[in-house]
Amino acid sequence: MWAFPELPMPLLVNLIGSLMGFVATVTLIPAFRGHFIAARLCGQDLNKSSREQIPESQGVISGAVFLIILFCFIPFPFLNCFVEQQCKAFPHHEFVALIGALLAICCMIFLGFADDVLNLRWRHKLLLPTAASLPLLMVYFTNFGNTTIVVPKPLRPILGLHLDLGILYYVYMGLLAVFCTNAINILAGINGLEAGQSLVISASIIVFNLVELDGDYRDDHIFSLYFMIPFFFTTLGLLYHNWYPSRVFVGDTFCYFAGMTFAVVGILGHFSKTMLLFFMPQVFNFLYSLPQLLHIIPCPRHRMPRLNTKTGKLEMSYSKFKTKSLSFLGTFILKVAENLGLLTVRHSEDEDGAFTECNNMTLINLLLKVFGPMHERNLTLLLLLLQVVGSAVTFSIRYQLVRLFYDV
């Protein structure tokens, strides 16, 4: 029978600091409200009839509290060496991993805030996490350098038991960082969704880490908990203000900060495949959105659902374009997606020619297509429920289905 593992002292200190971080986040966000509005870092909620100015980029506050917690926490995992001198040799590789991870997250918070202020283009959004992930990749190279993977059972007759990916493994880790930071950013647009999905993912990772504390990779999962516990509580404080009806917007800063934090623990904690499984809804949303993200199908600047002021419910938003402007590939994708029930396509004509409309290709709009118009709060709850189901499926795969592919 599984017993709850004994927590080391640094984790208890981390938990206490995280609880203080929750209080600090809840307190600081309303305290800085006026400063953000005065700096014109504010906007209107397009899904509300009210045109009140709401402060944006509040992820920078939860991110700053997160960093302060971990900066103050740095000495505690190494107290035996600092104070009692009981260790034979200082664990430099653990110290470098901690500092390198903090550097990557700190860079991403800074670059995310720059994006909120400067309103960068999408091509820049791909470059920012790539640059911020370089310290992370260097830490992995100097501390571990292992690029060999265990081949799944069905492929072993062809590739053997182990396969050295070499530089491709670093490309994979860099792409993982880019995906994590942008995946949360493109599944957004309604109150509480960005912070809510991040909260569910972090809670799932914490549970996974605790279960694995009695395993062979205890130190890696303790390292992950050092980051996930404060992230969970600072995000909870942010969600308190971002929940419907939202009093603040989290901004791209939070999406980048959350994504890089997940990438850090997934890469340095050596469970990147499990990490990706926790991103199931985000992976589906990304694949579903690809035709618009690649501009095969015209993509408007905002793809969030639209408010029906008469019913007070959110409905699907649409992309409208001239039919003749669509390429052969775009036409083919539209027809296939429509036949599969993934898109609503409408055709019309006026004096300017023939036009085509299709709902914007996001998971949010797809749920509205399947379940019909719904209240914004209920839509957020449905999406978070889907995230929880994704985590449950991940645990089933990780501890049951994995036996079909690996020797565990």
Swiss-Prot record:
Side of membrane Cytoplasmic, spans: 39-58, 119-121, 187-192, 243-250, 294-375
Cofactor: Mg(2+)
Binding site for dolichyl phosphate: 125, 178-186
Activity regulation comment: Inhibited by natural nucleoside antibiotic tunicamycin, which acts as a structural analog and competitor of UDP-GlcNAc. Activated by Man-P-Dol. Activated by manganese. Inhibited by diumycin.
Positions on the Lumenal side per record topology: 1-10, 79-91, 144-166, 214-218, 270-271, 401-408
Topology of this chain in the membrane: Multi-pass membrane protein
Any one of the GO CC terms: endoplasmic reticulum membrane
Glycan-linked positions: 146
Catalysed reactions, semicolon-separated: a di-trans,poly-cis-dolichyl phosphate + UDP-N-acetyl-alpha-D-glucosamine = an N-acetyl-alpha-D-glucosaminyl-diphospho-di-trans,poly-cis-dolichol + UMP
Keyword set, alphabetical order: Endoplasmic reticulum, Glycoprotein, Glycosyltransferase, Magnesium, Membrane, Metal-binding, Transferase, Transmembrane, Transmembrane helix
Enzyme Commission numbers on file: 2.7.8.15
Family matches, as CDD domains: GT_GPT_euk (cd06855)
Positions contributing to Mg(2+) binding: 185, 252
pH dependence per the entry: Optimum pH is 7.4-7.6.
GO MF entries: glycosyltransferase activity; identical protein binding; metal ion binding; UDP-N-acetylglucosamine-dolichyl-phosphate N-acetylglucosaminephosphotransferase activity
UniProt subunit comment: Homodimer.
Function: UDP-N-acetylglucosamine--dolichyl-phosphate N-acetylglucosaminephosphotransferase that operates in the biosynthetic pathway of dolichol-linked oligosaccharides, the glycan precursors employed in protein asparagine (N)-glycosylation. The assembly of dolichol-linked oligosaccharides begins on the cytosolic side of the endoplasmic reticulum membrane and finishes in its lumen. The sequential addition of sugars to dolichol pyrophosphate produces dolichol-linked oligosaccharides containing fourteen sugars, including two GlcNAcs, nine mannoses and three glucoses.
UniProt similarity note: Belongs to the glycosyltransferase 4 family.
Protein name: UDP-N-acetylglucosamine--dolichyl-phosphate N-acetylglucosaminephosphotransferase
Gene source species: Bos taurus
